């Protein structure tokens, strides 16, 4: 099965990794400015607006990207599956290219030999090429994506090759900590209906998968074959 993965940040508004958006009211100049601790600035023109518009600023850190890369490589080794990683570095020559470079540097320095010994491969391609390949694939690999890409593509993969209810969601930290959850989240809409006394019907398969995945991992950690099988 194909397993898209996600990193932090990018266009998502989280407590630590926040994107910033501005509704432009009218004509004016938009700039991207970085101010170093010593006061020096790096300034780039985004756009000279002649009318109203919209601006979005996104960011990530090398530390976060490195942690994501380690988590992906370790998960691939743990599951003995090939790892694909895809961005659009031909267009995003700094932002996406930084992801590509960090993944490759970490792979070459720390994981190439381990992957070879495990009989699996690391493969990088452009996101549009990856989508075309995935739709024709039989599965059996991990597809690592940036945050937004993974959010969208995971639903596409689950719908094209089964259903959303059959999708699993596993949070993996670089230190090897695993957390299993139902991919659909808390189904808030159904819960509010339940509070009103209305009848609800929720597919429980994703919750079952979360429990069985966690039990299997616990079995691996405790070396209990009957549980980890």
PLM region spans:
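Glycine-rich phosphate/nucleotide-binding loop
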Residues: 134-228
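Short acidic, glycine/serine/threonine-rich loops at helix termini
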Residues: 17-23, 94-99, 134-137, 154-158
């Amino acid at each position: 099965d194909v397993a898209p993965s996600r990193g932090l940040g990018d266009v998502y508004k989280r407590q630590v990794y926040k994107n910033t958006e501005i509704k432009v009211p009218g004509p004016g100049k938009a700039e991207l400015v970085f101010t170093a601790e010593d006061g020096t600035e790096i300034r780039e023109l985004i756009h000279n607006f002649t009318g109203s518009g919209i601006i979005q600023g996104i960011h990530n850190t090398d530390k976060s990207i490195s942690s994501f890369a380690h988590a992906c490589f370790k998960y691939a080794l743990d599951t003995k599956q090939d790892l694909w990683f895809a961005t659009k570095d031909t267009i995003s020559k700094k932002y996406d290219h930084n992801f590509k470079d960090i993944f490759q540097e970490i792979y070459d320095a720390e994981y190439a030999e381990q992957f070879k010994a495990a009989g699996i491969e690391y493969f990088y391609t452009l996101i549009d090429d990856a989508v075309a390949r995935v739709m024709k694939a039989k599965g059996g690999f991990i597809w690592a994506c940036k945050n937004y890409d993974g959010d969208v593509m995971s639903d596409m993969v689950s719908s094209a090759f089964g259903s959303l209810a059959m999708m699993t969601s596993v949070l993996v930290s670089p230190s090897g900590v695993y957390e299993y959850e139902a991919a659909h989240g808390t189904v808030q809409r159904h819960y509010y209906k339940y509070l009103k006394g209305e009848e609800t019907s929720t597919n429980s398969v994703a919750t079952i998968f979360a429990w069985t995945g966690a039990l299997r991992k616990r079995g691996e950690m405790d070396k209990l074959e009957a549980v980890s099988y």
